UniProtKB/Swiss-Prot annotation:
This protein's name: Bifunctional protein HldE
GO CC terms: cytosol
Pathway annotation from the record: Nucleotide-sugar biosynthesis; ADP-L-glycero-beta-D-manno-heptose biosynthesis; ADP-L-glycero-beta-D-manno-heptose from D-glycero-beta-D-manno-heptose 7-phosphate: step 1/4; Nucleotide-sugar biosynthesis; ADP-L-glycero-beta-D-manno-heptose biosynthesis; ADP-L-glycero-beta-D-manno-heptose from D-glycero-beta-D-manno-heptose 7-phosphate: step 3/4
Family label: In the N-terminal section; belongs to the carbohydrate kinase PfkB family.
Region Cytidylyltransferase: start-end pairs: 344-477
Keywords, alphabetical: ATP-binding, Carbohydrate metabolism, Kinase, Multifunctional enzyme, Nucleotide-binding, Nucleotidyltransferase, Transferase
Disulphide bridges: none
UniProt EC number: 2.7.1.167, 2.7.7.70
Classification via SUPFAM superfamilies: Nucleotidylyl transferase, Ribokinase-like
């Protein structure tokens, strides 16, 4: 199924975890201190943003969702500032304020878009345990479509199993962003989202995707977790579910500017998508797009619905048009990874007419992506005789690629497209005319792979041969 934006405004997501306040001091630097070999920064702007679980909730709100946030803070001004930032962004805050403790604060000094130093202000929350959040957490489960556990190993989620058990009792899926090397503490979770370094710290180095999948499946079974989504930086992300085919998505970032908080964006988009009823692979595809957007921003940041919509449009348009066969196979694999159904047809398409256009629109309606395989000039000549084609293959393909219904056009040189159809193995193979499905080139390969073959009607009164005859019989002017 083609990926579309779900009704995010209907998604209620409960986020629980470690809360922190991110502060940014921006300034210019053009000299070295006489006191020590360090740059002198002239601070011109001070910025504050929610971090940790707060950034996850902020990402949910930026998508239009309804986040409920539970976590531990101190009884201090930083907690007040954090609550104000979040509530102004549409996040409902349910803080457990611990007397005598300080809210975790991280200060970053930035000049010319480069982070010069980070200062952490934190003493932890001695004696804190995840079960301490249950009084705020449990009443919020009713009506939530997903739970996110955002673990930064600061104490709020020390032994998160009581929170997972409460959510599962309420029938709410649980997504956890893990920390540490013991993933068994997330037993019962629907999904955990380690990055590659965190994953390999537990299972060892994975030299290839097959190893990653094999070890991921074993880890999921061992820890009692339904699925793992391993984020792999520039290599994209991989979804591993025991007993199901893995899903690998390529990274979508055009330029990586700052990876701070990218994991928060991924899990927030996943949870918000799942809370609207999206299947996990579809939510994963949206999360992959969101990650590609957010790493192009500085610091902990969010992704808007408008940005996601634009990224979806760009993704749909990218790679469209005339492709070589290797390029086509790569595009098909990527489309399938995003849950899209592939339709394929073929023909000479020498003189494009209204019948062709109507036929291709019918074909496109059978799935999400339409491939048109086009006979090259020598192939047309063998089939139609001397004098054909009227238009060379590059022109025929260019015209087809300009149609809104057509995604990809590929040439073939054989008398039939059986070989290229067998390489693509479309979900739906279509042909126009009065053929029997079994007589269609590529039928056996498509059906054997679980696809189907469909015969479509041509538009009456439209024929390339008739057009040629009319042109030949027309009086000279």
């Amino acid at each position: 199924m083609k990926i579309t934006l779900p009704p995010f405004d209907q998604a209620r997501v409960l986020v629980a975890g470690d809360l922190m306040l991110d502060r940014y001091w921006h300034g210019g630097t053009d000299r070295i201190s006489p006191e020590a070999p360090v740059p002198v920064v002239h601070v011109r702007d001070i910025e504050q943003r929610p971090g940790g679980a707060g950034n996850v909730a902020l990402n949910v709100a930026a998508l239009g969702g309804q986040p409920e946030l539970v976590g531990i803070t101190g009884q201090d001004e930083a907690a007040n500032e954090l609550a104000s930032l979040l509530e102004n962004a549409g996040v409902a805050c349910h803080f457990r304020r611990q007397p005598g403790a300080a809210t975790i604060t991280k200060l970053r000094v930035i000049s010319r878009h480069q982070q010069l130093i980070r200062l952490d202000f934190e003493d932890g929350f001695p004696g804190a345990h995840a079960r301490d959040l249950l009084p705020q957490y449990r009443p919020l489960l009713a009506g939530c479509g997903a739970v996110v556990l955002s673990d930064y190993a600061k104490g709020a989620l020390r032994d998160p199993r009581p929170l997972i058990e409460a959510a599962r009792e309420a029938g709410v899926p649980v997504l956890a962003d893990p920390k540490g090397r013991d993933f068994s503490i997330y037993r019962g979770a629907t999904l955990i989202t380690p990055n590659l370094a965190e994953f390999e710290a537990v299972v060892g180095r994975c030299a290839d995707e097959d190893t990653l999948v094999r070890r991921g499946e074993a880890l999921a079974r061992e820890c009692g977790i339904e699925a793992l989504l391993v984020t792999r930086g520039e290599d994209g992300m991989s979804l591993v579910r025991p007993g199901e085919a893995p899903v690998h998505l390529a990274a979508r970032a055009r330029e990586v500017f700052d990876v701070t908080g990218a994991g928060d964006t991924v899990i927030a988009t996943l949870a918000t998508g799942l809370a609207t009823g999206l299947a996990l692979p579809q939510a994963m595809a949206l999360a992959n797009l969101a990650a590609g957007i957010v790493v192009g921003k500085l610091g902990t940041a969010t992704v808007s619905v408008a940005e996601l919509r634009r990224a979806l449009q760009e993704q749909e348009q990218s790679g469209r048009g005339v492709l070589t066969e290797p390029e086509l196979l790569h595009a098909v694999a990527d489309a399938r990874a995003h849950g899209e159904r592939i339709v394929m047809t073929n023909g000479c398409f020498d003189l494009l007419h209204a019948g062709h256009v109507a036929y291709l629109e019918q074909a496109r309606s059978r799935g999400d992506r339409l491939i048109v395989a086009v006979n090259d000039d020598a192939s047309v000549r063998r089939l139609k005789g001397e004098g054909r084609p009227i238009n060379p293959v590059q022109q025929r393909m260019a015209v087809l690629a300009g149609l809104a219904s057509v995604d990809w056009v590929v040439p073939f040189s054989e008398d039939t497209p059986a070989r290229v159809i067998g390489a693509v193995l479309p979900d739906v193979l279509v042909k126009g005319g009065d053929y029997q499905p079994e007589a269609i080139a590529g039928h056996d390969a498509v059906v054997a792979h679980g696809g189907r073959v469909e015969i479509l009607d041509f538009l009456d009164g439209c024929s390339t041969s008739a057009m040629i005859e009319r042109m030949q019989s027309a009086p000279d002017t």
